[in-house]
Every structure is written in C-alpha cells, then in structure tokens.
C-alpha cells in the first residue's frame, strides 16, 4: 500500500480507482502548503524550542540554587515548627529549580546545605535566621547573639509549658495589679541575672529532651538557674489581664520563664499568650525577613547580597560554639535524593 500511495502522489495519470488515495495524499500536501499549516508547524517548533529553553532555564536555576551561600532571614508565621518551615522552604526552592530530576539525583555529591539558627516555638512568629551553602557555618553566631521580642503575657493563669498551648496548672487573682506594679519590678529582670529554664525545653536528661519526657508523662526535675543577660525590658501596654513587653536579651534566655517569673513576683502567675521575635542579630522583621511569597531563588539571592553587609568579613570563617545545649542549631545537608527527616518540636524561647 505504501508503494501505491507513493506512486499515486508522483503519478497524476492514475485516475478513478485510486482517487480516494490521491485525495488523501493530496490533502496532506495541500495542508502543508496552507498558511494555517505553516502556523501550526511554527507552533510545534516554538513549543520544542520552549521545552528546550525550559530545560536550560531549570538547569540554570539549579546551578544558581547550589551556588547560593550566606545568611538571610525569613518570616516564620504561627503554626509550623522551625523545622517544618525549613522543610517547606527547601521544597519550594527544589521545586522551582526542577530538582531533584534524574540528571541531578544521579550526581549524589550535589547537595543543598540549608539550616536555621535559633528555634522559634510553633506558637511564635517572627524572624528566623537561615543559612544556605557555606552560610550554615555562620549560624552558631546567631545563637549567642542578641534577640528582641514582643511578648503578650496573661496574668492569673499558669501552664505546664509556660505559654497558652499548655495545660493550666494554677490560677490566681490579678485584679489588684497595676501598671505601676509591673513597671516597678522590671528592673529586677534587667542586666545579668539568673534564670531557671522551662521544663518544656530542648534541655536534655540522659540524652533525651525534657519536652519529650514531659509528653510521655514522666516526672521532670527543674534544671538549676543559670546566668543570662537582659539588655532592656519595657512595658508597652497593660490591659488586665494582658500586658505587653518589649525585651532585648542575649542567647539562652527564655521569654516564657521571664513572663512566669514576673507573675510570681506580683504574687500571681502568668503565661505567654503571644510571642513575636522582632530581631535576631542584625536581622529585623520589618527590613530583612522574607515572607513566603518571596521564597524564590532570585529573591533569596538578592537578600543574601543585601544582608552580606550586615556581617564583618571574618565572621564567615568563625566557628563559635553554642552557649548551651538548648540553643538548637539545625543545619540540614540535603542530598537531593535523600528522604525527608522529621524533627521533634523544640521550644527555645
């Protein structure tokens, strides 16, 4: 049949008995010559070029992603843990770059190094510092650096976690407490002070986090008080039973313990209702923290360039140690075909 069709197309002397075949072949030839057919062919060719360009673009993005290096900040909302947010960021970047693809997963040495320094509770929001590439080596400096928080405390109620997510363990009256009473005791919590960390924290006993032991219902003994630093603290608002504090502190300081201690000092009790980290090191919530719609390779590259001026050059080579073991440093070395790892919830502020 193929020979006949070829013959029909090339031989106009053949007539009636082969006319259907001649019509079909002729139609195809005619279509190829029409403007619409040429346009269709052009579309197909353009699509092929677009697909090729897309592959090149993805490869370029993947190369750019793996070349990113430095420290930047993201805006952590209430809800996810810091580890969950880091996974979400990682997944968005890998998806944008089309990774992992077969070409990349075969190259097992290609890794995306990403981590965060200074965990925020799931119930807290604010600045979360992220390191990428060799920037992960700089994250330990974030743990010992200064941090600033806005905290809303609630008088008259204590919980086992020292915040509103915990089980209520005690209730006391607060109706006689005045704004002047609160302002009058804040000086006691300023400067170099001793602080007992919360039971629900990343501190460990026999290699296990105290928070994990508490979840199991095990009895956990309080850790001894240790030295911490509060650079400044002020009362921003008082509308009983709620009070708002602005606190700037050093590493290893717990806002939840501060609010609880303030309640006790006032002969009542208190817990943290809302917590926002407004600054960590040189990063501020307003100027530097990227919202989720800016978690793109290009936006992060621009942020890294902008934030590079915030650090002295020698800091990139400095490898400082965390002041204490509850200051969790999460540095993920993500091999592109490595399965996800679930992290426990850790409270560190």
UniProtKB/Swiss-Prot annotation:
Its EC number is 5.4.99.-, 5.4.99.25. InterPro entries: PsdUridine_synth_cat_dom_sf, PsdUridine_synth_N, tRNA_psdUridine_synth_TruB. It is found in: Nucleus; Cytoplasm, Cytosol. The modification Phosphoserine is found at residue 11. Changing residue 147 to E: Abolished RNA-binding and ability to promote processing of let-7 miRNAs. It is an enzyme of class 5 (isomerase). GO terms for biological process: mRNA processing; mRNA pseudouridine synthesis; positive regulation of pre-miRNA processing; tRNA modification. Pseudouridine synthase that catalyzes pseudouridylation of mRNAs and tRNAs. Mediates pseudouridylation of mRNAs with the consensus sequence 5'-GUUCNANNC-3', harboring a stem-loop structure. Constitutes the major pseudouridine synthase acting on mRNAs. Also catalyzes pseudouridylation of some tRNAs, including synthesis of pseudouridine(55) from uracil-55, in the psi GC loop of a subset of tRNAs. Promotes the processing of pri-let-7 microRNAs (pri-miRNAs) independently of its RNA pseudouridylate synthase activity. This is Pseudouridylate synthase TRUB1.
């Amino acid at each position: 049949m193929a020979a006949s069709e070829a013959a029909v197309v090339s031989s106009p002397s053949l007539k009636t008995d082969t006319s259907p075949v001649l019509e079909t072949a002729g139609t195809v030839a005619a279509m190829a010559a029409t403007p619409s057919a040429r346009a269709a062919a052009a579309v197909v060719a353009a699509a092929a070029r677009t697909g090729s360009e897309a592959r090149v673009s993805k490869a370029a993005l993947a190369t750019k992603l793996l070349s990113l290096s430095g420290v930047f900040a993201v805006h952590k909302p209430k809800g996810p843990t810091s580890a969950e947010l880091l996974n979400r960021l990682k997944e968005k970047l890998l998806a944008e770059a089309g990774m992992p693809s077969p070409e990349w997963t075969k190259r097992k040495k290609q890794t995306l190094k990403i981590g965060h320094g200074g965990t925020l509770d799931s119930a807290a929001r604010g600045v979360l510092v992220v390191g990428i590439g060799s920037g992960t080596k700089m994250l330990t400096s974030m743990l010992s650096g200064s941090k600033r928080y806005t905290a809303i405390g609630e008088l008259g109620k204590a919980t086992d976690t020292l915040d509103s997510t915990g089980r209520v363990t005690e209730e006391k009256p607060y109706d006689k407490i005045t704004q002047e009473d609160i302002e009058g005791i804040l000086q006691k919590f300023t400067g170099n002070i001793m602080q007992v960390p919360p039971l629900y924290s990343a501190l460990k006993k026999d290699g296990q986090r105290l928070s994990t032991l508490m979840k199991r219902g095990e009895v956990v003994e309080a850790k001894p008080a240790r030295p911490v630093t509060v650079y400044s603290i002020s009362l921003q608002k008082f509308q009983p039973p709620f009070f708002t504090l602005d606190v700037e502190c050093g590493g290893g300081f717990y806002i939840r313990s501060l609010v609880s201690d303030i309640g006790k000092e006032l002969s009542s009790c208190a817990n943290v209702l809302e917590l926002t980290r407004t600054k960590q090191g040189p990063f501020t919530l307003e100027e530097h923290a990227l919202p989720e719609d800016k978690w793109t390779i290009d936006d992060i590259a621009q942020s890294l360039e902008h934030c590079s001026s915030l650090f002295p050059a020698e800091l990139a080579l400095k490898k400082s140690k965390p002041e204490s073991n509850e200051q969790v440093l999460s540095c993920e070395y993500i091999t592109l075909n490595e399965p996800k790892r679930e992290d426990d919830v850790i409270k560190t502020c």
